[in-house]
Amino acid sequence: MTEIYVDADACPVKDEAVKVAERHGLTVHIVSNSGMRPTGHPLVKQVVVPAGPDVADDWIAERAGPQDIVITGDIPLAARALEKGAAALGHDGRPFTQDSIGMALAMRDLMRELRETGQSKGGGPAFSKEDRSRFLRSLEDTVQAIRRRPPP
C-alpha cells in the first residue's frame, strides 16, 4: 500500500499532501525534529525524531519503499528515496528522477560552495501559488501513476 512521507521541517505543502492522501485513503507520515500541532486526522501519523543532522531524513529513508512517495526539499534525501525505488517530489511539485537527481546534487553542491565563498547570497524565489498548484497536480499524478503500476 502506498504511503506518503513528508520531510516536514520547513515544508510549505503539508496540508496539500494530507488533502491528496485523504482523497486516496493513504497514510501520511509527517516527520519533523520539532513539535507539531496535532492534526487528529486518522490518516496522519506525526513523527517527532530527535534533533540532529539528517535524523528525520534517516527515519524516512529507512522506511520508504517502491510504492511510496517522499516529499522533501532535501536533495540528498530525494536521492536516497529514489535508490529505494520510491517516488520523490520537491515542495514545488517538481519530481526528482533518476535522470535529474545527479544534476540536482551537483547544483546543490555548487550553490553551497558559492555561498561559502560569498559569491552568492541566499536562496531562490519565494514559494508561490503556482508552486502550490504544481505540487497538488504533481502529487495527484504521482499517486495515480503508482496505483497503475504492478506491485513489486
Swiss-Prot record:
HAMAP family linked: UPF0178
Organism from which the protein derives: Parvibaculum lavamentivorans (strain DS-1 / DSM 13023 / NCIMB 13966)
Region (Disordered): 114-152
Skewed-composition ranges (Basic and acidic residues): 128-140
Name under which the protein is recorded: UPF0178 protein Plav_1521
Family: Belongs to the UPF0178 family.
